[in-house]
Amino acid sequence: MGRTVNCIKLGRELEGLDFPPYPGELGKRIFENVSKEAWAGWIRHQTMLVNEYHLNLSDIKARKYLAEQLDAYFFGSGAEQPRGYVPLAK
């Protein structure tokens, strides 16, 4: 296991990312506070948002929306769930 971080999303000490996954200050905060496991959770959530909202990633508005959701997912009150989303029962 490489470097560890106290993961802000999962609330425990876990393996950290190998490099900042996003540019700028937000990428630095993610690198310092988010585990690989939590980042994988964001990738799944981001994929759901892109698919459900048919986001075009070449559109600046779509990229801005995803950046806002990324910040909310880790450092805010949580990212938005698509309209009508019902999580699978466990």
From Swiss-Prot:
According to the UniProt entry, its GO molecular function terms are: iron ion binding
Keywords for this protein:
Iron
The UniProt entry, under InterPro entries, shows: Fe_traffick_prot_YggX, Fe_traffick_prot_YggX_sf
Pfam families reported in the protein's UniProt record: Iron_traffic
A GO cellular component annotated for this chain's UniProt record is:
cytosol
- Which superkingdom is the protein from? Bacteria
Which cysteine pairs make disulfide bonds? none
Swiss-Prot/TrEMBL GO biological process terms = cellular response to oxidative stress
PANTHER family given in the database record: FE(2+)-TRAFFICKING PROTEIN-RELATED
- Could you tell me what this protein does? Could be a mediator in iron transactions between iron acquisition and iron-requiring processes, such as synthesis and/or repair of Fe-S clusters in biosynthetic enzymes.
Give the record's family classification: Belongs to the Fe(2+)-trafficking protein family.
Q: What protein is this chain from?
A: Probable Fe(2+)-trafficking protein
Q: Which organism is it from?
A: Nitrosospira multiformis (strain ATCC 25196 / NCIMB 11849 / C 71)
